[in-house]
């Protein structure tokens, strides 16, 4: 297309993988499950954004659906890439053939359907939120800090990309959920005082607080200050996830020099070749995220703290 830069092969591959993974995210296997509904809300919100921002691409997918021939897929042509992706996204090859995948994508990139499914997932998700503001694993269970963190992290990611409108229900969800975390994490000053090494959940909360910037009570404010001090002093003992979260926290709170030191430390653990950069010890790290999500966290941290880092291209 005139005036457009020719996309690179990694970009095309990445876009193809993301698009083929979205149908798996938008499926709602369990309306009583926070993770399932959260994935459906997130996936349909992203799909709607793709429809709005890439009308020509959507038109091309719809046109391809009308044809009998198949669209060559980099996924099926590269065994190494296929195996890496399928370890955590097995639904990508669940379709019997490429034509079926194109059909799935065409159905996914239907804005009316996206909006309908997005609304349905949000309505069900709001119904799962407990009176204390937290989210359970399943309907009827008590509020869980990890699940509540996941919901707010999803919200924050969509919010910072301007993909969420002025929805009163979402504002209420955010307010009640962050208040739950404020009380459970920052408000527990006695536990914080006795804690030598912060958990990744505490660090995830601190990063969320810098993004959402919600009011804290006097006790919660004191607890947050204690947590931040412990994070800055103890980051060297954290795992990769903890180091990345601490770097984001320090960067967002104005301590950019310390954040850069942590990023340099993270890069010291990486395997660097002429073309690629990755962390081989992710699997042995016993991270609370999946391997792909942890790599993404590390990559995003490097991009946030050192946006002009020449090594970023090798991480994608």
Region annotations inferred by a language model:
Residues 1-316:
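Large, well-folded core regions of big proteins
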């Amino acid at each position: 297309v005139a005036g457009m830069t020719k996309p690179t092969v990694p970009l095309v591959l990445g876009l193809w993988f993301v698009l083929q993974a979205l149908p798996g995210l938008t499926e709602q296997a369990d309306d009583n499950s926070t993770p399932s509904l959260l994935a459906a809300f997130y996936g349909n919100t992203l799909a709607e954004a793709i429809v709005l921002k890439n009308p020509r691409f959507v038109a091309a997918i719809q046109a391809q659906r009308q044809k009998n021939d198949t669209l060559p897929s980099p996924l099926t042509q590269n065994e190494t890439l296929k195996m890496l992706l399928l370890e955590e996204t097995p639904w990508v090859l669940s379709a019997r053939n490429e034509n079926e995948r194109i059909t799935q994508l065409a159905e996914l990139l239907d804005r009316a359907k996206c909006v309908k499914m997005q609304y349905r997932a949000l309505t069900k998700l709001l119904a799962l939120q407990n009176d204390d503001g937290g989210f359970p694993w399943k309907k009827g269970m008590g509020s869980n800090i990890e699940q509540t963190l996941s919901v707010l992290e999803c919200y924050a990611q969509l919010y910072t990309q301007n993909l969420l409108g002025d929805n009163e229900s979402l504002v209420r969800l955010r307010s009640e959920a962050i208040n739950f975390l404020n009380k459970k994490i920052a408000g527990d000053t006695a536990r914080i005082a006795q804690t030598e090494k912060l958990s990744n959940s505490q660090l995830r909360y601190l990063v969320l607080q810098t993004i959402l910037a919600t009011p804290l009570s006097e006790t919660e404010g004191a607890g947050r200050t204690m947590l931040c001090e412990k994070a800055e002093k103890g980051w060297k003992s954290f795992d990769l996830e903890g180091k990345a979260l601490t770097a984001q926290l320090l960067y967002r709170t104005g301590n950019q020099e310390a954040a850069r030191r942590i990023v340099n430390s993270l890069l010291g653990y990486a395997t660097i070749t002429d073309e690629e950069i990755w962390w081989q010890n992710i699997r042995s790290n016993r991270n609370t995220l999946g391997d792909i999500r942890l790599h993404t966290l590390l990559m995003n941290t490097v991009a946030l703290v050192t946006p002009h880092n020449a090594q970023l291209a090798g991480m994608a």
